[in-house]
Amino acid sequence: PEDIERVASVLLNEPFAEAAAKTAEIQAARGLALADVVRQLCEYVFRLHLPPKARARLVSEMADVEHRLAYVTHEKMQLYALVGAFAAAKEDVVKAAVN
């Protein structure tokens, strides 16, 4: 759980390149597979205070990443997709706050 909170914090607060690099570092240091990270992040996302549309989109994109990982797609590419999903969620949160 502590590692997942760190990953979530990185994904929500760091720019794209740094988020990808730091997430990969955490995975390597802790021996975490990306599929396991995605599954645990999904549970974590439901505890966050996100606008419903942002949460729905993020969870949907995370499910897509998990699905692609199940079919042995390139893990680094899926890491970038995960980082992109969180980047889009950050934009959705900003849009919701402005409206």
Regions found by a protein language model. Name each.
Residues 7-99:
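Helix-rich C-terminal "collar"/helical-bundle subdomain used as an assembly and partner-interaction module
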